[in-house]
Amino acid sequence: MEQPSEFTLCLPGDPVPKGRPRVYNGHAMTPKRTVRAEERLFAEFRLKYPQAKPYQCPVRLEAEFWMSHRGRPDLDNLLKLVLDSLNGVAYVDDAQVVESHASKRMPDLWVYGAKGRYRKRKSGDPYTYCGHEYEPHLYIRIKPLPEWEPKERKQS
């Protein structure tokens, strides 16, 4: 099987941030929610790309986190979970990610009401972003970047 030119993955459900390890009796324990989310992302990647080998070159990672609520978690913690989960399957090491673009999409505060006017969003309303409905999910795209060497070095 030929190596894909890029990896894409869409995971339904609310994106999960990387939790801080807790220390008990001198041992660091990763929260169960974080472990389950990392295992799920790893498994979904393997399911979609069973024969793919990890990229060995620099890569660009794009991630869109479509949330079910506003506010927390922080974007960097969401991205950390993705980077750590795909270590060894999409790329050899997350140090290869030299370019990234991450965005956290949150539901609109105002929705179009039944009376034809905007009103504050209520808990039972569908999720909308800029007026367009969506379901919470995570979208990831990983693309290899060409390795570059100066001309002087190539000739010698």
Regions inferred by a protein language model and the residue ranges of each:
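Acidic, proline/glycine-enriched N-terminal capping motif
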Residues: M1-S156
